Amino acid sequence: GPWQALTASGGHYSSLAGDSDDVFCLLLKMERCAAVSLQMNYLDRSGRREVLINTDKHTYRLDLMKKEYKRDQEPDTLFSIERDETYRTQHTDMLKNHGKLCCSLPEGLDVLRMIDAAEKSAKAESWQKNQALR
């Protein structure tokens, strides 16, 4: 379900050129999940791209750099994916399939509201509620 509230910390902390954010951490309260942690870090020299999901029944780990998927203590499952394949697939879908695999306009606007709330939270050092739910 939709995010309920979030708090964030982040910004431009490096000597990298430009003024875009290079580190951001979010803690979100979701409709059906009390705590979601999301981190973006362009300073990580090891180039990690990971998804870790803990539920009351399982732990799932997806490592996009090592091309490994793991559930609980099961052996790793290897998969094949080119580095930029997800981006190419997204653009191909937009051009050939009218974006049927992409998010809807309302979903995209919700992501933009979340980004705006994260920026406000980092600046104010406070929790932000999802205004769309009021």
Regions flagged by a language model, labelled:
Residues 43-45, 68-69, 76-77:
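Short, surface-exposed beta-strand-loop junctions and turns on beta-sheet-rich folds
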Residues 78-92, 103:
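Active-site loop of classical SDR/Rossmann-like NAD(P)-dependent oxidoreductases
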Residues 1-35, 40-46, 106, 110-113:
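Rossmann-like dinucleotide-binding domain that binds NAD(P)(H)
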